[in-house]
Amino acid sequence: SGSCQLKTCWQVTPDFRTVGTLLKHKFYNATLIKAHNRNTGQVEHAHHHPHRRKSSAGELVFFEESPNFCESEPKLDSAGTRGRICNKTSPGLDNCESLCCGRGHNILRQTRQERCNCKF
């Protein structure tokens, strides 16, 4: 009787944190490029650096800067974040450090009386 060997290869997606960390690193190291208008498919780095190599296949590149969502931009229908209410203790996107874009914030303390319809 003969022996039989079976090999199976498969790819497994890394855990979510690993993927997120990799994407964040690629995002912060992305390169601004500009396309030539010659239908050649060629692109060049917008900030010409003689020592800069060509972009690699796994590198993130972008054609235009992202808008500054902190400031009002009527053309983009963006009201900005000035005057928005933030949550000083929140770890989320509504926290004051993130939402106020480093401009600082005012603290508003309120005391309210509300009917609670309590039953004793």
UniProtKB/Swiss-Prot annotation:
UniProt's post-translational modification comment states:
Palmitoleoylation is required for efficient binding to frizzled receptors. Depalmitoleoylation leads to Wnt signaling pathway inhibition.
Q: Name one GO cellular component term.
A: extracellular space
Q: Which residues cross the membrane?
A: none
Q: Where in the cell is it found?
A: Secreted, Extracellular space, Extracellular matrix; Secreted
Q: Which UniProt keywords apply?
A: Developmental protein, Disulfide bond, Extracellular matrix, Glycoprotein, Lipoprotein, Secreted, Wnt signaling pathway
Give me the residues lipidated as O-palmitoleoyl serine: S1
Q: What does this protein do?
A: Ligand for members of the frizzled family of seven transmembrane receptors. Required for normal tooth development. Regulates the expression of genes involved in tooth development.
Protein name as catalogued: Protein Wnt-10a
In the record, what lineage is assigned to the organism producing the protein? Eukaryota, Metazoa, Chordata, Craniata, Vertebrata
Q: Which gene encodes it?
A: WNT-10A
